[in-house]
Design a protein with these regions (language model features):
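Residue-level recognition of alpha-helical structural elements
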Residues: 7, 34-37, 66, 89, ...
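Conserved alpha-helical segments that form or flank metal/cofactor-binding pockets of metalloenzymes
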Residues: 44-71
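Helix-loop segments that flank and shape redox-cofactor active sites
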Residues: 21-42, 84, 100-117
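A contiguous pocket-lining binding segment that forms or flanks enzyme active sites
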Residues: 108-134
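Amphipathic alpha-helix face/heptad-repeat signature
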Residues: 14, 44, 92-96, 124-128
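Basic/polar, acidic-poor N-terminal "presequence/leader" segments
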Residues: 2-32
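Acidic/His metal-coordination segments adjacent to aromatic residues that form catalytic metal sites
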Residues: 1-12, 73-96
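His/Met- and acidic-residue-enriched segments that coordinate or traffic transition-metal cofactors
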Residues: 1-12, 39-42, 53-57, 105, ...
Length: 134
């Protein structure tokens, strides 16, 4: 049904976004001015990969092939991040906090219309971004 497909689409775009965030944060960590900040950004990257795995499991539990359902979102997400690549560490921090915060707020709002288990999955991922710990 349409609602089930919309749920899969939302989980898929969020999953691919988390995978891309892992890759992006791994690169951003290299821009850090000291080892402490590099470790903190790397920890965030690891968290994003954990979110990706949670979402992939959620997709599989709904009978979806994660790679297939994420495929339509790859190009637009990759293009967005390529066009907003940070030039230095301060720009990377702005993107981490502002951009990712806006995305998390958007996903939380859309999740209000999902079935309770799917909403809980999105909330779990968005609530555990860990950026405030940095």
């Amino acid at each position: 049904d349409a609602r089930a497909q919309a749920t899969i689409d939302l989980l898929a775009v969020l999953a691919y976004g988390e995978l891309e965030a892992f890759e992006r944060l791994s690169q951003d960590a290299l821009l850090a001015p000291n080892m402490g900040e590099r470790e903190a950004v790397t920890d965030m990257a690891v968290g994003e990969y954990g979110h990706y795995k949670i979402l992939v499991d959620g997709l599989r539990a709904r009978g979806a092939d994660p790679q297939a359902v994420m495929a339509p979102f790859r190009r637009p997400i990759d293009e967005f991040h390529a066009s907003t690549a940070p030039a230095d560490y301060p720009e990377a921090l702005v993107k981490i906090y502002v951009g990712d915060g806006i995305a998390a707020d958007f996903y939380r709002e859309v999740a209000q219309f999902l079935e309770p288990d799917a909403k809980a999955l999105v909330d779990e991922v968005c609530d555990d971004l860990g950026h405030s710990a940095f």
